[in-house]
């Protein structure tokens, strides 16, 4: 009798445990995983994970799963390959020069349609116009992707090195002519490297051109048609590359690589100045062991009307096609979460990327962040310096990642002395135009 009672009690407990486990399993299965492939590493990756964790705590039916997939080129290639294989992520972070490629593909679901289908009345006007305009479809007037980590290049400089060289640590060079003078003085004061810069196409061609009121290509840099032609081999751009070549020969400008290698050389104290993404601020803040400042990009003192306005870099979030309704609803909720003023402001403040919404910018001002962190508003001020001209609002060129590679190759031939600046830019334009024609044909 006693043994029977024990057996019955054990059976009841076992059954109860099974029911509980089944309920837990059902609850776990109810949450829809939403893969989010990105290119944010280091401190930036930590912030992406933090945003996802906060969202996931507020939403039990969906789970954002951030996955680092390498740099921008690697992530885009991985996303395209995954789509072709039928296992693309729900959200893919794509850098700004991939915009034309994504627009022309059949792999995406426009973000405005994602909101509409999810029944979320999302106001696209919350985004800063100069940011959202980059990702807006000219025909519908709606966003194709959602701005996320938008940036402009800024000048980072070592204040301690400036003091040692007898330079005012509160006055970074404003023009490229001053840059040449400052780097010579910094080198004379013992700095191994006066100035370094990566992302040559974005900084030394695209943003140099916009900042000095010049087009990179016809058809307003491709916004008005795929039959655009590159034209960055004009006298002002050639003169700029010549100045850098002269600095390079003297040892005042050092080329370390195509991506973020110069940023590391800066925060390690080897280089006195670098032009890099405003989004590099998080890593510089984490690693620099010296006093540093943030200044605007230098401009050409001889360029009429300069400085004009900077054009954005960074990336936006694209929603991939072929997903179910539950996934798209979760994606829409996450996009809405990212655009909330408190979340967009925190992302801006912790990373150095631009405040992508007007409310985030106003909240950051109200919190006194810019007063406590001088220079943190430089990227925004550059972007809003003057109303953009038709050809300084951004770039929308097909095969742009490949064109940037061409620019890298041609400028590297200048730094090694194999070509003159004019020869290199002429070749870059010729090779780039061939890539544009190939893209134009593919869209017909």
Swiss-Prot record:
Location of this chain's protein in the cell: Periplasm
One annotated GO biological process: transmembrane transport
Residues reported in the UniProt entry to bind sn-glycerol 3-phosphate: 72, 96, 151, 277, 314, 353, 404
InterPro entries per the UniProt record, alphabetical: Bact_solute-bd_prot1 (IPR050490), SBP (IPR006059), SBP_1_CS (IPR006061)
Coiled coil: none
Keywords: Periplasm, Signal, Transport
Main localization of the protein described in the UniProt heading: periplasm
Subunit structure, interactors included: The complex is composed of two ATP-binding proteins (UgpC), two transmembrane proteins (UgpA and UgpE) and a solute-binding protein (UgpB).
Family recorded in the similarity comment: Belongs to the bacterial solute-binding protein 1 family.
Protein's recorded name: sn-glycerol-3-phosphate-binding periplasmic protein UgpB
Gene name tied to this protein: ugpB
